[in-house]
From Swiss-Prot:
InterPro entries: Alpha/beta_knot_MTases, tRNA_m1G_MTases_N, tRNA_mtfrase_aTrm56. S-adenosyl-L-methionine binds at L82, G112, A113, E114, K115, V116, V130, G131, N132, Q133, P134, H135, S136, E137. GO terms for cellular component: cytoplasm. Its EC number is 2.1.1.206. It is found in: Cytoplasm. SUPFAM superfamilies: alpha/beta knot. This is tRNA (cytidine(56)-2'-O)-methyltransferase. It comes from the Archaea. GO terms for molecular function: tRNA (cytidine(56)-2'-O)-methyltransferase activity. It comes from Methanococcus maripaludis (strain C5 / ATCC BAA-1333). It is an enzyme of class 2 (transferase). The keyword tRNA processing applies. HAMAP family: tRNA_methyltr_aTrm56.
């Protein structure tokens, strides 16, 4: 199963840091690609620097029409929309995992930066809430991806990494490849 993240909306200066965190969280927790609906050179370059240093094959893409992208994806994949107004993650997560496992389909995860159009709710196979209190989309994304993968991606190591951290009880264990 491949996981892609579709970030709806991005408000330039206001969102560049949080959008970067959305991309880095996506990469760190198992997604293969993040798709933005707005061009942002700063976010793209930040993500590319991380991938260059920490490895992997994470992709950054910009699409003109999120609707077209999501509709095409849904033809052969499963679309989950993270929203405060969706079904309780504790009640629906097993069903989502089983659906993916049974169908062997890829997953598109929609998260918003601003008010999400009604069409996203209608298009999604699942509208899922991670709690019913206001919090960050980064938190919702991290919790969902961790639950989806059952913690298996937390300590992933990536091919071609120039920097690697090894968990340790008492010291920093960092490997840095010299050029």
């Amino acid at each position: 199963m491949a996981i892609e993240i579709l970030r709806l909306g991005h408000r330039g200066e206001r969102d560049k840091r949080i959008s970067t965190h959305v991309a880095l969280t996506s990469r760190a927790l198992g997604a293969e690609k993040i798709i933005f609906t707005e061009e942002d050179k700063h976010v793209k370059e930040s993500v590319e620097r991380i991938v260059d240093s920490w490895g992997g094959d994470f992709k950054f893409e910009v699409v003109k029409s999120w609707r077209t992208y999501a509709k095409r994806f849904k033809d052969n994949g499963i679309v989950v929309h993270l929203t405060m107004y969706g079904e309780n993650i504790n009640k629906i997560m097993t069903e989502i995992r089983e659906d993916i496992s049974k169908t062997n389909k890829n997953l598109l995860l929609i998260i918003g930066a601003e008010k999400v159009p009604r069409e996203a709710y209608d298009l999604a196979n699942y509208n899922l809430s991670v709690g019913n209190q206001p919090h960050s989309e980064v938190a919702a994304l991290a919790i969902f991806l961790d639950r989806l993968t059952e913690g298996k991606t937390l300590y992933s190591e990536y091919d071609n990494a120039k920097i690697k951290v090894t968990p340790s009880k008492s010291e920093k264990c960092v490997f840095v490849e010299k050029d």
